[in-house]
């Protein structure tokens, strides 16, 4: 990913320089008679456009610009109010979103923060010697990287007088230094190692640290309500580590729903044939997705959801066969098989393989920001020998389908005891599987007339 960034930076510098160089070379070659002049015939034969090297400059410049545009990773970051709401007359998007959130019935909710690993941020956003602020599970964290490349995660607020270590804090060795009084805390165990104006550092001077890991181009943080150390690991996608698959972009959305509702979609097989059958040209507004204008393109889905046995009982799989119908006709060459492997409550690897479009993975991560606000990211990695346009199209198509779900989630009520038919059996099975990520002390919220009661 870093090499892609360097390539784009280099190209952005070289494009204007290359254009000037091509212009100069073209002028020299034309002056020497080594290139043919371009003649523009008009009614007046004496009018000619000659000795102009525009073609020599324009064509390579357009090629360079096109290559740069196609190679650049697609970054589509949506704000919380941007997707999933029907605008109300006389109100802005933000006002509409806030109104819907206030008046929506919440239902009888499960615990709000399941135990597990969660994505904090992407690795390329944390260069050596820097610190980033991160909101995770209702808390503020400081994520920093030492000059040697090691990543640590600590509470953002200094236990001395509460300064935010991620706002002006400095990385010193393997410690982070508070911008307020210069206290330094070691990332490994949180121990304060230096107070500039104190003769001795007291033993009680510590900051809370969080278990973390870095792989697949991301930094993950472990959460357990009882402070238990990690009981399972985030799997490594070897093709990403070996750079056989390269990064082509990500999307990021905010969803106003309980975290469990998002992965539950994998077991809600019936919704695929109803919500996601219309082609992507039908858009994301559910009022219009079934318009007959785009009815000639339809998606077909065959899905199976299964939990994995021990020792991987924290994992489950959705096996999906996708096909496209054009004017009611099936084209087998467009079929795609997807294996979506859920690891814990907040990480999914959507591995897809196509006969001639190649192979790749979308890493789907759900991170609770606060009780009913989830940050959902989709990062795509694809075979490096496949044109970048292919994975970017796949990511955009995934984004459109996902935003249809967002419109449902942002406006729905959670029902703890849903009215199910036998064809919905996988939903109840998924809820039993997901319950393993809650424990007796998992935080809960209840909603009363007077407000929010924690």
Swiss-Prot record:
A single GO CC term for this protein reads: membrane
- Write out the residues that bind [2Fe-2S] cluster: 158, 160, 178, 181
Q: Could you say which enzyme class this protein belongs to?
A: oxidoreductase
Q: Which SUPFAM superfamilies match?
A: Bet v1-like, ISP domain
**GO biological process, any:** cholesterol metabolic process
Please name the Gene3D superfamilies in this protein's record. Naphthalene 1,2-dioxygenase Alpha Subunit, Chain A, domain 1 (3.90.380.10), Rieske [2Fe-2S] iron-sulphur domain (2.102.10.10)
Q: Domain of life, per the record? A: Eukaryota
EC number in record: 1.14.19.21
Q: Which Pfam families match?
A: KshA_C, Rieske
Catalysed reactions listed for this entry = cholesterol + NADPH + O2 + H(+) = 7-dehydrocholesterol + NADP(+) + 2 H2O; cholesterol + NADH + O2 + H(+) = 7-dehydrocholesterol + NAD(+) + 2 H2O
Topological type in the membrane: Multi-pass membrane protein
Single GO molecular function: metal ion binding
InterPro entries assigned to the protein according to its UniProt record, in alphabetical order = Cholesterol_7-desaturase, KshA-like_C, Rieske_2Fe-2S, Rieske_2Fe-2S_sf
- Hey, which pathway is this one from? Steroid hormone biosynthesis; dafachronic acid biosynthesis
Keyword annotations of the record: 2Fe-2S, Iron, Iron-sulfur, Membrane, Metal-binding, Oxidoreductase, Transmembrane, Transmembrane helix
- Transmembrane segments in this chain: where? 13-33, 47-67
**Entry's localization field:** Membrane
- Cofactor(s) of this protein: [2Fe-2S] cluster
How many and how are cofactors bound here?
Answer: Binds 1 [2Fe-2S] cluster per subunit.
Q: What does this protein do?
A: Catalyzes the production of 7-dehydrocholesterol (7-DHC or cholesta-5,7-dien-3beta-ol) by inserting a double bond (desaturating) at the C7-C8 single bond of cholesterol. This reaction is the first step in the synthesis of the steroid hormone Delta(7)-dafachronic acid.
| UniProt similarity note | Belongs to the cholesterol 7-desaturase family.
Protein name (Swiss-Prot/TrEMBL): Cholesterol 7-desaturase nvd
């Amino acid at each position: 990913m870093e090499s892609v960034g360097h390539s784009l930076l280099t190209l952005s510098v070289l494009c204007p320089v290359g254009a000037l160089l091509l212009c100069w070379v073209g002028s020299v070659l034309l002056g020497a008679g080594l290139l043919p002049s371009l003649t523009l015939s008009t009614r007046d034969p004496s009018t000619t456009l000659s000795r102009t090297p525009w073609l020599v400059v324009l064509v390579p410049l357009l090629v360079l610009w096109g290559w740069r545009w196609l190679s650049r990773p697609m970054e589509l970051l949506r704000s919380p109010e941007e997707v999933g709401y029907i605008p109300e007359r006389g109100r802005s998007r933000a006002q509409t979103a806030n109104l819907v959130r206030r008046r929506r019935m919440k239902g009888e909710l499960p615990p709000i923060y399941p135990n597990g690993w969660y994505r904090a941020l992407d690795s390329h956003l944390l260069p050596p010697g820097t610190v980033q602020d991160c909101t995770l599970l209702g808390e503020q964290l400081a994520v920093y990287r030492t000059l040697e490349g090691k990543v640590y995660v600590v509470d953002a607020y200094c236990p001395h007088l509460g300064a935010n270590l991620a706002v002006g804090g400095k990385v010193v060795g393997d410690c982070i230094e508070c911008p307020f009084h210069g206290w330094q805390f070691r990332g490994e165990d949180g121990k304060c190692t230096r107070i500039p104006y104190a003769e001795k550092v007291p033993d009680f001077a510590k900051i809370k640290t969080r278990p973390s890991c870095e792989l697949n181009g991301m930094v993950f943080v472990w959460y357990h309500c009882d402070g238990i150390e990690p009981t399972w690991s985030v799997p490594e996608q070897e093709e990403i580590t070996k750079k056989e698959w390269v990064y082509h972009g990500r999307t990021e959305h905010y969803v106003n729903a309980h975290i469990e509702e998002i992965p539950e979609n994998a077991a809600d097989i019936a919704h695929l044939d109803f919500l996601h059958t219309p082609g992507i040209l039908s858009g994301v507004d559910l009022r219009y997705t079934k318009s007959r204008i785009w009815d000639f393109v339809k998606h077909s889905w065959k899905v199976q959801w299964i939990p994995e046995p021990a020792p991987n009982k924290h994992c489950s799989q959705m096996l999906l066969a996708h096909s496209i119908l054009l004017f009611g006709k099936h084209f087998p060459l467009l079929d795609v098989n997807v294996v979506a492997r859920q690891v814990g409550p907040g990480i999914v690897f959507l591995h897809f393989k196509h006969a001639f479009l190649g192979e790749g993975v979308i890493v789907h991560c759900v991170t609770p920001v606060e009780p009913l606000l989830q940050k959902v990211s989709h990062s795509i990695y694809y075979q490096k020998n496949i044109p970048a346009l292919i994975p970017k199209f796949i990511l955009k198509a995934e984004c459109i389908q996902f935003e249809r779900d967002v419109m449902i989630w942002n406006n729905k009520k959670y029902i703890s005891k849903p009215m199910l038919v036998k064809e919905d059996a996988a939903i109840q099975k998924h809820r039993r599987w997901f319950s393993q990520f809650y424990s007796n002390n998992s935080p809960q919220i209840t909603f009363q007339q007077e407000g929010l009661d924690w």
